[in-house]
Structures are given as structure tokens and as C-alpha cells.
């Protein structure tokens, strides 16, 4: 059975690209036509490429490897968090902090600090500290949780990145390229496909489209993890 159907893609509006004046000519081969000043993505190609990315994600997960979900634009935040949690992976959905990959050592120190503050909140340390100090520490903890909560369980570099909107997440992509980490991404008509290892041509602005494609990739991970368990 196909991992995604043409009907699902159409219903979620995956075929709607950007306005024709905002396009990247490198995406020409994935465009079916132009309608009312908007590019329409060729969903036959999308179906095939979703299948390819699904198999890549499944393969990575079956090896017990880690995939980091990244989508910080408003339309992607909820789907990125929900689907990463559903398939037991990590995510960044607020802001990509420069060096999250290339300077992971420093990021790790901030994650350790978050764990320390959480422990202090749990073990009663906050109750014996001056009120002013507790307010300050809670504020620090909330800020760290906001930006690092999705990766606080990540002890080492991810083996791959799944990205919504490579234009928005260009720093994440640059860092992944520097470290040779493969990138799987939804790529709209205004993006550069050359930066991506495994792409899904599709609408990265509609909440339903982002949710459908992100959920499909999460399904691939869940399936891959089951393969890993049966092999064990």
C-alpha cells in the first residue's frame, strides 16, 4: 500500500506552491502548472518522493538512529512537536540557536543546566531559597525549556534532520552540511532543492499540508523502530 495517496495530498493542499514571482527556477521540474499567479506542484512527483523519504526515515530509525525534527515557523510548530513526540524523536520548534549542532558541547551545558534547575524544582531546593532568587531561577528554567525542551533528552548529535521550510531553517541546514548530517525536507517552490539530500516537493505554509507530511515521516520512524525491535 502507498504510504500516502494523491487524495490525501490534494485535500491537505500540498499542491499549492508560492506566487509565481517568488520562485526558485531550480524547482521548475517539480511544478505542474501555474494557476491564478500561483505555482501548482506536480503531486505525482510528490507521491514518489514522499515514498523515497519514507523509506530513508524508516531505514534510519531501524538502525536505532536519531532524527531531529526542525520547524520554527508558526504553521509548523505544533505538528513538529506533536509528531516528534509521537515517534519518540527530538525537535526544535521555537528558534534554532546558532551552534545547536556545530557547537553541541556548549548547547549540552545549557541542557545540563536545565536538568539541574528541574531537579531543584522537584527536590524542594526552591522552597528553601529566597523568593527573589526562585523567581529568577524559574524564569531561567522556563526560557531554557522553551528553546531546548525538545532536545533535552538528546545526549549526542542527531543522525539526520527532518526540516519544514529550508529557507527559514537555513542555519540548521548549514550546520548539518558542515557535519555531514543528511537532511530530509519539505521543499516549496521558492526553495533551493540543491541544499537538501532527500526532498518532498510541497506546500510548507499550510498547517494541514505540513501536518500530513510530518505525520507521514513520523509513521516511517515508528515502522522503522518496529523493525529494529523484531531484529533484536
From Swiss-Prot:
Keyword Cytoplasm: no
Transmembrane segments: none
GO molecular function annotation: structural constituent of ribosome
Matching HAMAP family: Ribosomal_uS2_B (MF_00291_B)
Cellular component GO terms held in the UniProt record: cytosolic small ribosomal subunit
Name of this protein: Small ribosomal subunit protein uS2
Keywords: Ribonucleoprotein, Ribosomal protein
Family stated for the protein in its record: Belongs to the universal ribosomal protein uS2 family.
Family annotation (PANTHER family): 30S RIBOSOMAL PROTEIN S2 PROKARYOTIC AND ORGANELLAR, SMALL RIBOSOMAL SUBUNIT PROTEIN US2M
The keyword Ribonucleoprotein is assigned to this record: yes
Organism (species): Alkaliphilus metalliredigens (strain QYMF)
InterPro entries tied to this protein: Ribosomal_uS2, Ribosomal_uS2_bac/mit/plastid, Ribosomal_uS2_CS, Ribosomal_uS2_flav_dom_sf
Gene3D superfamilies in UniProt: Glucose-6-phosphate isomerase like protein, domain 1 (3.40.50.10490), Helix hairpin bin (1.10.287.610)
Alphabetized SUPFAM superfamilies for the sequence: Ribosomal protein S2
Biological process, per Gene Ontology: translation
